[in-house]
């Protein structure tokens, strides 16, 4: 029977519940247990697809086209297991489902209430993951902080869930803060005690405490928390700050987290194999060749807006024994401040995705600089569209060329709306989303990097290259090296006269893994190393 681990958070938000959940997933998988991780988000949006990156960070897209919380990216990267739309649940989606059932008459005229209808729907979503994926363990992260009014239906649902499924099949893990107070020179347990008290008032007694702290727990703290929170001392697990999130599974393994989880769930204790993960962390900390990469975007004030891009770069840097340094460049300020000043001496330039006209001219200027200066360049989604506009204006001779998204009256709409998007009014969940096949041109840079002729990548866009300009681009030196299998949609463009210039309509960052860096990011950093007269082992990773 499937076991369930619920992860709640207390005291403050952004305490690291997602990393703890993902790390536990890695520890269980290292013991040959199958795992799926579910995120329950308390906001009323149906999904984060229409939310501002400044508020929410990046939107992570799954193979089946779900627009989800960025934590699902952590889940995939740590467990190397694809997530789906079943792994992301919001208050909005719960209420939407319940209201739809009420409109259909499913409740037979009954009064629809938070208990039992909302809580039953939450429990059904949890069970659906277990039924669909049949994992040994489902880890469920509850978004928000205990005490938030938005989280109450989820907490009530998981309280009921433990009673219905059975205590030996369910475990409650609470991630909390144990702060160091400099003026007192002491660690304080009171915030954790109050957080657990709040949780217990709802009817949930945590089985394990994960104690977030900026330093090792001082002697006596574990015993004090054990006494006041009614948790066995061996289940009070310190989680001090780490230099990298990829070190967290190893730290939690040393503290015995997985052992306690298996004990409490009556699962067999198995020997873990974390050798590859240990080697990954050693390579990360052993990297000694610095390489600076510029990320040119309009959401750079919040680095989480480009989280998967940064992680994909980091995966490749680890494989290439490079110390990755990110130079954040605000595309809104780029033209005014000067492109050369902002991008001088960078090893590579990445222009990631986005929506809307704001900051686009800065992205185009950065792409022109990369092309003219021979700096390795990778464009992603909107980054490819901006590369098309840049080429159209400066090489193909199409004055005022633009995307129809930014200028509906442009004389040269080199980027236009996908035909199937013409009559769509709603914004949420209506783009070209999810995993699609792409056919690569023989002998192209893309084929050389991937080592395959047909690839599969995740998409999130409404606009595409306008095929009316395809021949002109080919005649002026661009190459179209990736298309949809029917040849209709342009997915990859290259400039072969450049050391490394490639742009793609999809989001390769979502499929990069710590132990399997994505070929495009690996190729970018390898080209940057070559440009810097550094040795690099090979063009594609060998994992």
Curated annotation (Swiss-Prot):
Pathway: Pyrimidine metabolism; CTP biosynthesis via de novo pathway; CTP from UDP: step 2/2. Its EC number is 6.3.4.2. L-glutamine binds at residues 354, 382-385, 405, 462. Coiled coil: none annotated. GO terms for biological process: 'de novo' CTP biosynthetic process; pyrimidine nucleobase biosynthetic process. Disulfide bonds: none annotated. GO terms for molecular function: ATP binding; CTP synthase activity; glutaminase activity; identical protein binding; metal ion binding. UTP binds at residues 13, 188-193, 224. It is an enzyme of class 6 (ligase). Allosterically activated by GTP, when glutamine is the substrate; GTP has no effect on the reaction when ammonia is the substrate. The allosteric effector GTP functions by stabilizing the protein conformation that binds the tetrahedral intermediate(s) formed during glutamine hydrolysis. Inhibited by the product CTP, via allosteric rather than competitive inhibition. Keywords: ATP-binding, Glutamine amidotransferase, Ligase, Magnesium, Metal-binding, Nucleotide-binding, Pyrimidine biosynthesis. The keyword Ligase applies. Homotetramer. This is CTP synthase. The gene is pyrG.
């Amino acid at each position: 029977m499937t076991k369930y681990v619920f992860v709640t958070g207390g005291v403050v938000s952004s305490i690291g519940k997602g990393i703890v959940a993902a790390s536990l997933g890695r520890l269980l998988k290292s013991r040959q247990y199958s795992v799926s991780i579910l995120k329950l988000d308390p906001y009323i949006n149906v999904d984060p697809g229409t939310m501002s990156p400044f508020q929410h960070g990046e939107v992570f897209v799954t193979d089946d086209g779900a627009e989800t919380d960025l934590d699902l990216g952590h889940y995939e990267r740590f467990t190397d297991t694809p997530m789906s739309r079943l792994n992301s649940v919001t208050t909005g989606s719960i209420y939407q489902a319940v209201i739809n059932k009420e409109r259909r008459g499913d409740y037979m005229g009954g009064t629809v209430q938070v208990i039992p209808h909302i809580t039953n729907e939450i429990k059904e979503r949890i069970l659906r993951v277990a039924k669909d994926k049949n994992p040994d363990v489902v880890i469920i992260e509850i978004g928000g902080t205990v005490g938030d009014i938005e989280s109450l239906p989820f907490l009530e649902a998981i309280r009921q869930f433990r009673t219905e499924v059975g205590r030996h099949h369910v475990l409650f893990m609470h991630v909390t803060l144990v702060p160091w107070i400099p003026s007192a020179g002491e660690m304080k347990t009171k915030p954790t005690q109050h957080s657990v008290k709040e949780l217990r008032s709802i009817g949930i007694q945590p089985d394990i405490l994960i104690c977030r702290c900026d330093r090792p727990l001082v002697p006596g703290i574990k015993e004090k928390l054990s006494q006041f929170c009614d948790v066995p001392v061996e289940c009070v697990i310190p989680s001090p700050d780490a230099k990298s999130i990829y070190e967290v599974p190893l730290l939690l393994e040393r503290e015995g987290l997985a052992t306690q989880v298996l004990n409490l769930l009556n699962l067999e204790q198995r020997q873990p194999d974390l050798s590859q993960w240990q080697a990954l962390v050693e390579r990360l900390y052993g990297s000694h060749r610095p390489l600076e990469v510029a990320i040119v975007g309009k959401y750079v004030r919040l680095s989480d807006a480009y989280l998967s891009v940064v992680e994909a770069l980091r995966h490749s840097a680890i494989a290439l024994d490079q110390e990755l340094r990110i130079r954040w460049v605000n595309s809104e300020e780029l033209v005014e401040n000067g492109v050369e000043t902002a991008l001088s001496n960078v090893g590579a330039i990445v222009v990631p995705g986005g929506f809307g006209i704001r900051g686009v001219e800065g992205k185009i200027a950065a792409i022109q600089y990369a092309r003219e200066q021979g700096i390795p360049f990778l464009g992603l989604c909107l980054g490819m569209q901006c590369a098309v506009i840049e080429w159209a204006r400066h090489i193909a001779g199409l004055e005022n060329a633009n995307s129809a998204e930014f200028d509906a009256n442009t004389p040269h709409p080199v980027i236009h709306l996908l035909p199937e998007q013409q009559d769509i009014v709603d914004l949420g969940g209506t783009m070209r989303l999810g995993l699609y096949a792409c056919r690569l041109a023989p002998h192209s840079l893309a084929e050389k990097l991937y080592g395959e002729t047909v690839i599969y990548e995740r998409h999130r866009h409404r606009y595409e290259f306008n095929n009316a300009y395809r021949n002109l681009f080919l005649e002026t030196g661009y190459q179209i090296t990736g298309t949809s299998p029917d040849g209709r949609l342009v997915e990859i463009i290259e400039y072969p006269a450049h050391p490394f210039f490639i742009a793609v309509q999809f989001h390769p960052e979502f499929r990069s893994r710590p132990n399997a860096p994505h070929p495009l990011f690996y190729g970018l950093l390898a080209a940057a190393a070559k440009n810097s007269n550094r040795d690099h082992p090979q063009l594609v990773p060998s994992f």
